[in-house]
Amino acid sequence: MYLQNANESLVVVLTAAKDTLDCSIVCDINDHDASGMITPQVAAQASTNGTTEVTITTGGADKNRQVARLTLYNNDTDIINAVFSKKISGTLYGIVKVQLQPGATAVYSKDGA
């Protein structure tokens, strides 16, 4: 997935209140400009905030941002449901909804692995 400018972002929200702990998020990012991929690669870390939307990463004004890998770990003691969306100028475009048992991890990779 690419975020093509500063008006595009990747967001997550839980569909119900957490029991005790928010989920951990790690997002590995490849940035690209007119010359190609910018190195070194970067990572963004975040935590869910209950039923409040959380921005994981946002595109740049002069670069494309590629989400290379994304993990969501359920730190909670109960099952969680999380919805990931691409947000463009305030409009949400649903990507995926995942349900995780306590201690489980959801993984997205641009390579499909």
Regions found by a protein language model. Give the residues of each.
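Surface-exposed, low-hydrophobicity beta-strand/loop segments enriched in small/polar/acidic residues
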Residues: 1-113
